[in-house]
C-alpha cells in the first residue's frame, strides 16, 4: 500500500531571495512559487509573514493559494505563548484566539504554537488550552502544540498533555530538530507521531554523506513505523548555499524515504 505522507513546505525559507542578489518572493506570490518551483501542494505559514496584513489581504492570499492548488494548511507561531501564567493565561488564550481568526481567513485548518509549560503549572496549562480550543472551534480551527521550548516536557510529557486535553481539535507538531535534540530521535518521533497532524522535516544542510546532522531517511522510517499518514513540512533552517537547490535535494531524499519518486498532488 502506498504511503500517504504528503510533503509540504514551511514558508519561512521564503524570507530569503530565491536568487542571489534578487528580491524575496512577494507574500501574495508564495503559493504559486511553491507550486511551480517544488510541485508541492501545501504550505505551513509562519505568522510573522502576515503580521500587519489586513483581513482582505489574508483572504486574497487564500484565494491565490486555492488558485495555485497549494493551500495554506497550518499557521505557525514561533514565539512561545505562556498558557500557565498567574493571570489564568488570559493573554495567551487571547493570542491563540487571534491566531484562530487569522487562520480562518487564510483557510488554515490548524494553528501551531510553542507553549511555555512550567512543570508546576501543567494543570493550569491544560485548563487554558481547553479554553483556547473552545474559541478555536468557533473558527473550525484546531490547535497543534510544538515541541522545543525550554520549559516544554519531553516527548512523553507532551503526549501526556495532549491526551489529557483530549478531543479531535488538539494535536502535536514535532520537528526532526527537536527530536534530535531530545537525544533519541527515533523514539521522540514515534512517541509524538500518533498525535501529530504535521511534522516539521527540519533541514540544515548537506555533506558528502547526506544530511549534515541527522539521517532524513531514518526519521521518515520512524514515522512510517507507527503508521503516520499525514503532513511532512520541509523546514529549511540552513544558512549556507543555494537554499532552493538544497530544498529540492531534501525533497528528493524525503520522497525516496517515503517511497515515492515524485510528489502526489
Segments and roles (model prediction):
Residues 11, 38-47, 74-79:
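Short, conserved active-site loops that position catalytic residues or coordinate cofactors/metal ions
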Residues 1-39, 66, 152-170, 174-265:
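Histidine-acidic metal/acid-base catalytic patches
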Residues 21, 51-52, 90, 123, ...:
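Residue-level marker of alpha-helix boundaries and capping positions
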Residues 57-67, 127-138, 188-191, 218-223:
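Catalytic-core regions built around general acid/base machinery
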Residues 41-63, 115-120:
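Glycine-rich, proline-tolerant flexible connector loops at the mouths of alpha/beta enzymes
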Residues 2-3, 32, 64-77, 81-174, ...:
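Active-site acidic/histidine proton-transfer and metal-coordination neighborhood
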Residues 49-50, 80, 118, 151, ...:
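Positions that flank functional sites
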Residues 26-48, 102-109:
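Catalytic domains of carbohydrate-active enzymes, especially glycoside hydrolases
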Amino acid at each position: 500500500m502506498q504511503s500517504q505522507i504528503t510533503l509540504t513546505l514551511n514558508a519561512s525559507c521564503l524570507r530569503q531571495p530565491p536568487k542571489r542578489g534578487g528580491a524575496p518572493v512577494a507574500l501574495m506570490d508564495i503559493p504559486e512559487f511553491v507550486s511551480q518551483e517544488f510541485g508541492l501542494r501545501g504550505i505551513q505559514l509562519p505568522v510573522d509573514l502576515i503580521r500587519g496584513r489586513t483581513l482582505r489581504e489574508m483572504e486574497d492570499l487564500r484565494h491565490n493559494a486555492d488558485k495555485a492548488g497549494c493551500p495554506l494548511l497550518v499557521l505557525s507561531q514561533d514565539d512561545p505563548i505562556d498558557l500557565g501564567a498567574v493571570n489564568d493565561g488570559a493573554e495567551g488564550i487571547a493570542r491563540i484566539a487571534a491566531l484562530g481568526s487569522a487562520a480562518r481567513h487564510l483557510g488554515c485548518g490548524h494553528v501551531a504554537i510553542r507553549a511555555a509549560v512550567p512543570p508546576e503549572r501543567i494543570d493550569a496549562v491544560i485548563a487554558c488550552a481547553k479554553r483556547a480550543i473552545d474559541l478555536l472551534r468557533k473558527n473550525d480551527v484546531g490547535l497543534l502544540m510544538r515541541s522545543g521550548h525550554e520549559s516544554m516536557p519531553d516527548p512523553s510529557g507532551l503526549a501526556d498533555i495532549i491526551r489529557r486535553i483530549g478531543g479531535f481539535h488538539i494535536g502535536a507538531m514535532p520537528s526532526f530538530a527537536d527530536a534530535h535534540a531530545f537525544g533519541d530521535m527515533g523514539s521522540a518521533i514515534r512517541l509524538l507521531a500518533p498525535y501529530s497532524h504535521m511534522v516539521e522535516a527540519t533541514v540544515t544542510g548537506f555533506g558528502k554523506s547526506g544530511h549534515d546532522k541527522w539521517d532524513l531517511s531514518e526519521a521518515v522510517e520512524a514515522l512510517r513505523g507507527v503508521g503516520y499518514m499525514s503532513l511532512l513540512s520541509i523546514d529549511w533552517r540552513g544558512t549556507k548555499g543555494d537554499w532552493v537547490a538544497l530544498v529540492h535535494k531534501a525533497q528528493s531524499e524525503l520522497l525516496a524515504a517515503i517511497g515515492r519518486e515524485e510528489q502526489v498532488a
